[in-house]
């Protein structure tokens, strides 16, 4: 029988797709199954690709959208910071859930992800966090029902297992119906599919030049234990992430060469 008792007293939800994004609605439905009290503090507009960035040189504007629901003119990191340190300062959340992102956040791409950035900002200020993303094969037919069906049990299992305070969890749901998902795998980050950044240029109706940034993706060899491989095999991929980014091989080589 599926567990129905509240897991948390208070949970904070955020994302990088914006407060009106369908993935946030999915996450709210998930959170109401897990918590007695759900707070939503999310960007007023799409903030995809903003990573861990914080708005240090301009003020944040916070707009109340309902009971315990706020839109912030800022990044996902801003949302987490102002929620925990201001809006919820008298009763901090037990956990921050970030997502559900439209599309997977895998490998190198997690460095740029605002969804993951929000979770890592939460970790920085001492609140456990999970980033959740729903992979798709057709952007116009994202299988949100997969995350909706599986996320409550996945979160319960992760909380029961526990994880270190200097890590947040990155969860990716595969692009298939929930009944066809093969299970859950704990994975490493791996390389993912991000190859670089492309520039798409043009001219607007006023004949002013513009430039769009586009992430370039392509299949690449990856570690057998990576999240990208697990997702491709039909598993929910769970990867613990941390801030520490030292390249150990380069460190050893430079120390040998330079002392």
Curated annotation (Swiss-Prot):
Alphabetical UniProt keywords: Cytoplasm, Hydrolase, Metal-binding, Nucleotide-binding
Chief localization: cytoplasm
GO cellular component: cytoplasm
Record note on cofactor: Binds 1 divalent metal cation per subunit.
UniProt-annotated location(s): Cytoplasm
Residues involved in a divalent metal cation binding: 16-17, 48, 101
InterPro entries cross-referenced by the UniProt entry: SurE (IPR030048), SurE-like_Pase/nucleotidase (IPR002828), SurE-like_sf (IPR036523)
Enzyme class: hydrolase
Pfam families: SurE
EC id: 3.1.3.5
Gene Ontology terms, MF aspect: 3'-nucleotidase activity; 5'-nucleotidase activity; exopolyphosphatase activity; metal ion binding; nucleotide binding
Known catalytic reactions: a ribonucleoside 5'-phosphate + H2O = a ribonucleoside + phosphate
Cofactor(s) required for function per UniProt: a divalent metal cation
Job description of the protein: Nucleotidase that shows phosphatase activity on nucleoside 5'-monophosphates.
Family that this chain belongs to: Belongs to the SurE nucleotidase family.
Name assigned to this protein: 5'-nucleotidase SurE 1
Organism: Burkholderia lata (strain ATCC 17760 / DSM 23089 / LMG 22485 / NCIMB 9086 / R18194 / 383)
């Amino acid at each position: 029988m599926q567990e129905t008792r509240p897991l948390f007293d208070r949970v904070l939800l955020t994302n990088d797709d914006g407060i009106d994004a369908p993935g946030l609605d999915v996450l709210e439905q998930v959170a109401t199954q897990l918590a007695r009290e759900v707070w939503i503090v999310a960007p007023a507009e799409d903030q995809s690709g903003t990573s861990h960035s914080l708005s240090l040189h301009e003020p944040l504007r916070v707009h109340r959208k309902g009971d315990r629901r706020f839109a912030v003119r800022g990044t996902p990191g801003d949302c987490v910071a102002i929620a925990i340190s201001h809006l919820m300062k008298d009763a901090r959340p037990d956990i921050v859930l970030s997502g559900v992102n439209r599309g997977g956040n895998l490998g190198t791409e997690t460095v740029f992800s605002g969804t993951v950035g929000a979770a890592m900002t939460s970790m920085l200020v001492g609140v456990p966090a999970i980033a959740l993303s729903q992979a798709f094969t057709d952007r116009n037919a994202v299988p949100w029902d997969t995350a909706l069906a599986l996320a409550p049990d996945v979160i319960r299992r992760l909380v029961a297992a526990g994880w270190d305070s200097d890590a947040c969890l990155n969860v990716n749901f595969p692009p298939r119906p929930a009944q066809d998902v093969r299970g859950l795998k704990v994975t490493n980050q791996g390389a993912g599919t991000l190859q670089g950044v492309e520039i798409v240029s043009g001219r607007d109706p006023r004949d002013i030049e513009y430039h769009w940034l586009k992430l370039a993706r392509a299949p690449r060899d990856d570690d057998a234990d990576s999240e990208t491989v697990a997702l491709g095999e039909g598993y929910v991929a769970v990867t613990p992430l941390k801030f520490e980014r030292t390249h150990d091989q380069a460190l050893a080589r430079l120390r040998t060469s330079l002392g």
